[in-house]
Amino acid sequence: MLATIGYISNATEHLKKGDIENIVKDAILYNKKHGITGILYFANGKFLQFIEGDRAEIEALYQKLSKDSRHNDFVKFHDADISERAFGEWDMAIR
């Protein structure tokens, strides 16, 4: 079953620009392997992300992300089953 999760989080103080680029590179590889699509927005030290794919895959990714030391204060504000992807052509994009 397809599902989507949306969350916000705060970047930790030690996060640098190169870290953001690494996050995106890692996300593209991971997401392709696991059939996950989505979007990542980063501004003013805050992340906003939507991930979509198989329910088990995005739940596993969300748990992995919530343990990543590069950000904290996670708030999941969206969690729903979906009939189609909003970001079906995207492995991951950052804006």
Task: Tell what function each PLM region has.
Residues 1-95:
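Charge-rich, low-complexity N-terminal segments
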